[in-house]
Amino acid sequence: MFKKLFRQDENILNSELAEDLPIPRHVAIIMDGNGRWAKKRFLPRIAGHKEGMDVVKRVTRYANAIGIDVLTLYAFSTENWKRPTDEVDFLMKLPVEFFDSFVPELIEENVRVNVMGYRENLPNHTMRAVEKAIADTAHCTGLTLNFALNYGGRSEIITAAKEAMKELELEGKSADDLTEEKLNDHLMSSGLGDPDLLIRTSGELRLSNFMLWQLAYSEFYFTDTHWPDFSKEDFLQAIIEYQNRSRRFGGL
């Protein structure tokens, strides 16, 4: 059944994309607008998060279908702990339900789960769900579904710099020997590559402390669509927009 779901998406999506233009290798998404989506429908905010979880599953299928290597989703920031307790509690339970229902499909489709963020601050039930999903899909070699969970870009850079400096000290070197490559090796996203395309939903035009180092030369795509309404057509439009841009990385 899972194979059928993925193959249907593959046929529809690939028919819409230009074959002679590049597909982004790494797509990152700031999934914004769950609360606004719920408010518009006179529903509690958690209803938006619940609907958003289903969209994560669909977008994962789309990304896998067109051959994206890494899909990074901003699930929970280090600042999100400031939200109401009942909302935070619900968000910390979502990974349990999400992975329990979706990991069998991910395994069948050779999708590997990765999580970057400060795991030590997560509740035990969330941590167990995360670690089990990572372990259960560790053998998979296809798409990497990477969640930024309890993640903050500034903290990540500081942590990476400290770790890089400690390594340099052990090597008998100084701060003058610190390079971009050395720092990059200690980022939470090390080994995944920088995002080629950042998508942000719900009309907000900011990064919100997300992958500040890695997004230096990424292409940005903003849409007014709230995350729970983000459709196959919205995803396709973002990819097509990327295909029609010229990436210069600071050159001409």
From Swiss-Prot:
GO cellular component: cytosol
Key words, A-Z: Magnesium, Metal-binding, Transferase
GO biological process: polyprenol biosynthetic process
Sections of the chain in a coiled coil: none
Residues binding substrate: 33-37, 45, 49, 77-79, 81, 83, 200, 206-208
Enzyme Commission number(s) from the entry: 2.5.1.-
SUPFAM superfamilies linked to this entry: Undecaprenyl diphosphate synthase
PROSITE patterns linked to this entry: UPP_SYNTHASE
Residues at the active site: D32, N80
CDD domains linked: Cis_IPPS
EC top class, as a word: transferase
InterPro entries in UniProt: UPP_synth-like, UPP_synth-like_CS, UPP_synth-like_sf
Listed name of the protein: Isoprenyl transferase
Gene transcribed to yield this protein: uppS
